[in-house]
Amino acid sequence: MCIRDRWLCAPKGSAFLHVRKDLQNLIHPLTISHGMTTPLGNSTRFRHEFDWTGTRDVSAWCVLPFVIENLTKLVGMNWSEIITHNRNLAIRGRKIICKKLNIVPPCPDYMISSIATIKISSNQVNEIDLYEPDPLHVKLLEDYDIQVPVWSWPNPQGRYIRISAQLYNYEDEYEYLANILEKCL
């Protein structure tokens, strides 16, 4: 899946989902307009279910060539450089947070793209409802205007935070987050 509005600064609604052919029979959309019972012809059930899920506006997809070309001009980097920039920023952000919270990174840097998940220490893991917003997430958002996913998970048990890096992020934002996390945990 590619969320193009986040990673390409494209309009919302331009995301796509790729599924390996051998797994397509296991994946179904949340809403099926008419593809469930349509005769297949030369197509697959996967295509019938996903290709037409109802009324849609394709204009977000139509502007993608413009977005791709103009974002590189705007920042003066090609796409390979943008990807490298975001990856390096995510790695630096993870290091800043891990160092501040005295956490060993859960995986080597080569496994990081532009998103990094960090297991944070918490005495509350067993007390947090999996189906409710994590209190730390709420506190970060309401008290500090920080929007970052925080959740608890039963296996492997722990409380996690996920950071992402994009051209509009800066290292000092990860330092700010690390300082706030240190205060809140």
Locate predicted features.
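Active-site PLP attachment segment
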Residues: 1-40
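Glycine- and other small-residue-rich loops at beta-strand/loop junctions that grip anionic moieties
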Residues: 6, 53, 166
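Short acidic/glycine-enriched loop/turn segments that link adjacent beta-strands
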Residues: 11, 112, 156-159
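Structural motif of enzymes handling amino- and sulfur-group chemistry
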Residues: 39-95, 114
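Alpha-helical structural signal in soluble globular domains
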Residues: 66, 92, 96, 100, ...
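Conserved PLP-binding catalytic core of the aspartate aminotransferase-like
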Residues: 83-91, 100-143
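PLP-dependent enzyme catalytic core of the Aspartate aminotransferase-like
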Residues: 129-132, 138-185
